[in-house]
Amino acid sequence: MALSKTAIVQGLQGIVGGANVITDEKELQQSSIDRLRLYEDVHGVFTRPIPAAVVMARSTQHVVDVLKYANRSRINVVARTGRTATEGGLETAVANSIVLDGSGMNGILKIDPYNMQATVQCGVCLQTLEDEVRKHGLTTGHSPQSKPIAQMGGLVATRSIGQFSTLYGGIEDMVVGLEAVHPPRDERRPL
């Protein structure tokens, strides 16, 4: 039997704390779509199922714990970061889904100029990363129109391309490795 919206919210609050669970109705409506349905957002006509909550993940452990809960409770999860996608991939397909927002995981953990690599979290803004690597005489080589606001998790998830992709390749050509959480075991592992 499916959990009620109230039960889902209470479960999430117990996992990540109340401050990290958004239940504001307007925010939930806007979280049911991405930029593909800009008309709906502008005119407030939302036709997609509304999620139960938006969870602001602050750590990989938050992601692990929320996915364990969702998998055990059979709740759909939509992962997002910068909310700039235009592919329809951020839309909720089932009512009372969980939108798992990684934008708070925004640390640049390491820049290695020698190997020309950076280790970043999913919520790092591409422009912020570009500004940091330029201090070392480097570039990300990735320049989509959403560069000022797009975040790494979404760029990788959508196989982003940009103005210099014919020279540097798409984002998938720039990723050396990543850590992912995989249900149903909900384990963290590098890929």
Question: Where are each of the predicted segments found?
Answer:
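Residue-level detector of anion-binding/catalytic polar loops
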Residues: 74-76, 139
